[in-house]
């Protein structure tokens, strides 16, 4: 028995369709706010003899536009919105969040060795996301250990780290199998992007996302799930095996980055050595990878970071 029906919803983003999930009068991650996405979701609801006004709750796994954009329309139609406590302020003021990220990462990327003009271009690009993700009020801000009832099933909330600020999973048991809605934290055939994240509050310490993501994946593996319902593409039917593959990929790239910092090297130099001449549209992802693996080396005591005249360099510690 399948508790959730997967509905691929079109997005304008490179990743392709996002998976919305329907169960009774609940929608999980409805998709971006576009007419094409809305028509797809409406058609899926109609196949189940529902209209948008019949949806009672929207669960949001993480505050990325391709996942939560349509939550605003569904809430206007009468649904309540459920998201994590950490994601709530982002969802409720998404333009403000984008402005905060732009300011933080412009300065940070310059410190990493990026030209000021390039940093401006790279950090301006995400502003387009606001067109697909209107802010939405969160009616129920949940934390790890909280439960949500969906079509007679009890879903338990737990924290995830690595892909987005405030991401959570919803776990449940059906047919004797432990299953979880995991958003984009684990995907079947592509490696999730461990995106850089700013401090929760201005002036705070930048979170070291990739080391935390590796730890989160290891914890998720030990939880013993039998199936993951993912944010894109097909479900993961062998979670432990897939997590092992992702962790192996991370370890291999970390070793390559270690080889690149035998001498003091900026994060931008590392990004260019890994990926070549990336277009501006892909440099945020590239910097997330480069800085993430440098953070892993730093956390393990395998690299030394220095800042001289406002520029960061990393050097391997042998």
Regions found by a protein language model. Give the residues of each.
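Hydrophobic "anchor" residues on beta-strands that sit immediately upstream
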Residues: 25-27, 58, 80, 178-180, ...
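C-terminal regulatory/interaction regions
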Residues: 256-318
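Metallo-beta-lactamase
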Residues: 33-34, 152-244, 248-249
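Conserved beta-strand hairpin/beta-sheet module of binuclear metal-dependent hydrolase folds
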Residues: 1-48, 169-189
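Gly/Ser/Thr-rich active-site loops/lids in small-molecule metabolic enzymes
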Residues: 247-259
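Divalent metal-coordination and catalytic microenvironments
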Residues: 23, 29, 62, 74, ...
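Well-ordered beta-strand scaffold positions
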Residues: 2, 25-26, 86, 146, ...
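Active-site HxH/HxHxD metal-binding segment of metal-dependent hydrolases
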Residues: 32-39, 43-147
């Amino acid at each position: 028995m399948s508790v959730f029906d997967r509905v691929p919803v079109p997005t304008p983003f490179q990743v392709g369709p996002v998976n919305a999930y329907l169960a009774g009068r609940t929608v999980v991650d409805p998709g971006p706010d576009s007419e094409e996405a809305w028509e797809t979701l409406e058609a899926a609801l109609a196949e189940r003899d529902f209209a948008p006004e019949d949806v009672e709750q929207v669960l949001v796994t993480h505050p990325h536009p391709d996942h939560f954009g349509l939550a605003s329309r569904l809430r206007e139609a009468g649904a309540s919105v459920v998201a994590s406590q950490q994601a709530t302020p982002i969802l409720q003021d998404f333009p403000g969040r984008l402005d905060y990220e732009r300011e933080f990462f412009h300065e940070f990327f310059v410190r990493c060795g990026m030209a000021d003009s390039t940093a401006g271009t790279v950090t301006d690009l995400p502003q387009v996301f606001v067109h697909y993700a209107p802010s939405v009020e969160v009616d129920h801000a949940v934390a790890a250990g909280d439960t949500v009832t969906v079509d007679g099933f009890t879903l338990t909330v737990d924290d995830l780290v690595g892909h987005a600020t405030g991401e959570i999973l919803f776990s449940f048991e059906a047919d004797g199998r432990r299953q979880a809605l995991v958003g984009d934290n684990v995907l079947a055939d592509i490696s999730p992007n461990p995106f850089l994240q700013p401090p929760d509050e201005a002036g705070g310490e930048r979170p070291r996302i990739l080391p935390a993501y590796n730890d989160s994946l290891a914890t998720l593996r030990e939880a013993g799930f039998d199936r993951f319902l993912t944010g894109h593409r097909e479900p993961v039917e062998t979670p432990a095996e897939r997590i092992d593959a992702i962790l192996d990929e991370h370890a291999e790239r970390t070793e390559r980055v270690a080889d690149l910092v035998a001498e003091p090297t900026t994060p931008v130099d590392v990004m260019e050595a890994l990926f070549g001449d990336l277009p501006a549209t892909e440099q945020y992802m590239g910097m997330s990878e480069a800085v993430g693996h440098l953070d892993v080396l730093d956390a393990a005591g395998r690299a030394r970071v220095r800042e001289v005249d406002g520029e960061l360099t990393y050097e391997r510690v042998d």
